[in-house]
Amino acid sequence: MKEIESFLVYSSSILPECILIFSSIGILSIDLLSLPNEGDTFWSYSISLAALAISIIILLLQWNKEPVLTFSETFQISRFNDIFRFFLLICSFLCIPLSVDYIRCTKMPVTEFLLFVLTATLGGMFLCGANDLISIFVASECLALSSYLLSGYTKRDVRSNEAMMKYLLMGGASSSILVYGFSLPYGLSGGEIQLRGMVNGLINMQMYNSAGVSIAMIFILVGIGFKLSLVPFHQWTPDVYEGSPTPVVAFFSVTSKVAALALATRLFHILFSSLSNEWHLPLEILAILSMILGNLIAVTQTSMKRMLAYSSISQIGYILIGIIAGDSDNGYASMITYMLIYIFMNLGTFACITSFGLRTGTDNIRDYAGLYRKDPILTLSLVLCLLSLGGIPPLAGFFGKLYLFWCGWKAGLYFLVSIALFTSVISIYYYSRIIKLLFTERNKRITIYMQDYKGSPYFLIPNNSIGITMILCTIASTVPGILINPIIAIAQNTLF
């Protein structure tokens, strides 16, 4: 009976991940057993979306379960880990409808795309709950390799191939640095691989305050800095964003950030909890550099995707305020709250530029001039998402930033919050510049695609899958502003 009970506990702990594994096998089987002209894409999309929806429901049903360590203490179930797993599932669930029309227009294979998306989601979910160094590395590489393949998904596009190579080379280098950082506390602790066991081993060996642990912390910070696109580890981000397919950029612009934030928070909270003074300063410097350079360089961009790349760099700088503030001042709760809102703001913006790009074939910001005349619904959605990203009241982004900055201020991060407020004003400038272009200027060098542009209906009924994602994300970027208190209460319930 004890073995059966243990099996049920273990299997239920990774049941959402198991559903994604079985759905991936099902999608691959459909592709292998069906003829090319049978039109199996409907079933592939349906299986993937159903698997993600079921996984979300299971996670919600498991919300009140007690924290538990399973699989020889290599995987941890807790509310904090579950909220990040939930974020990853939401991202994937919204990104798949975003890609349907894009894949149909570019005539790219569906099965490979869905497999890479589900595999990346699977790796990110395992990374959120991984409790030992081996599981952390394997899960992070599963997420990273799937992201590399997604960035080079359009093989016939030279820019996509270039983006994949840059992402692969930089990602491989960062993974090597991260593994080297893991190797130092592993050796100094006497061969421990579990996170808390490693801390106990370092204390017992009287090596916790040694130079080796400080060096390991620096290497781990560099490795995570790449995954979060923090300045100065951000060089790959604009090129990869510009060269990769837009739905792919939408996907890993949020999933990689969510998984890396979960990993960073757990490492700093568990492994380096007594060294907060040592890692606070470098993390503050990275946050300041990311906020300043990300927003300043975004002002000069002419490509919408490159602008969003630098915008995402600055947004992560804001989110780091929550990690630095820590648990005592609701820093983690503010980070979770803003991350949830950021997912919808970012995906909503990418849904708008995906729809515009498919209809016009351009990504240049100046080609958006006068869009409101052709497509008022797309214009309204883009305006609301950009204003929410800038933190304009009463949209959700304003309340998310307000809570994040307030928690940072209470934690004594006065200079960091002041920089965040100043750079937020800069971000409002380049967001409002795009909004002004949408309403006031006309594009004289209009393309043939823009001449035949068919706008969405004037009523809020989307006529394609991109429109569904766009409307949902726009609503989620707006409505939570008046429902921020319940969201904050849920976030405060997810702490360690």
UniProtKB/Swiss-Prot annotation:
Its main location: plastid. The chain crosses the membrane at residues 13-33, 41-61, 83-103, 110-130, 133-153, 168-188, 213-233, 245-265, 279-299, 307-327, 338-358, 380-400, 413-435, 470-490. It comes from the Eukaryota. One of its GO terms (cellular component) is chloroplast thylakoid membrane. One of its GO terms (biological process) is photosynthesis, light reaction. Keywords: Chloroplast, Membrane, NAD, NADP, Plastid, Plastoquinone, Quinone, Thylakoid, Translocase, Transmembrane, Transmembrane helix, Transport. It is found in: Plastid, Chloroplast thylakoid membrane. One of its GO terms (molecular function) is NADH dehydrogenase (ubiquinone) activity. Belongs to the complex I subunit 2 family. NDH is composed of at least 16 different subunits, 5 of which are encoded in the nucleus. NDH shuttles electrons from NAD(P)H:plastoquinone, via FMN and iron-sulfur (Fe-S) centers, to quinones in the photosynthetic chain and possibly in a chloroplast respiratory chain. The immediate electron acceptor for the enzyme in this species is believed to be plastoquinone. Couples the redox reaction to proton translocation, and thus conserves the redox energy in a proton gradient. This is NAD(P)H-quinone oxidoreductase subunit 2 A, chloroplastic. The gene is ndhB1.
